[in-house]
Amino acid sequence: HGMSEKLRLDVFRIVQEQMSNIIKHAKANRVKIGLSQNKVDILLSVADNGIGFDVTKNAEGIGILNIKSRAAFYNGNADFVSKPGKGCVLTVSFPNEYSI
């Protein structure tokens, strides 16, 4: 099964938003993007080796809120794991029911 047209666009927009965040804030020189699908979920990950941030203090920026709202539209989840000096990993999961 593939992803629906709308979900493909929203996955693209999430990657675009996170890349914008990385370019503006992370000072990263490497980004790894992964997309996989299993019987339960569609999983997207975007990891960078940038300066990181404190997710308890910086989790309400407009970019992060946009990513979380796009995931929530599909009953999905967006999770940011980061610490200052340790880069950032964004993991987004969508229920596989949105594939076609």
Regions found by a protein language model. Give the residues of each.
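Coiled-coil dimerization/phosphotransfer module
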Residues: 1-100
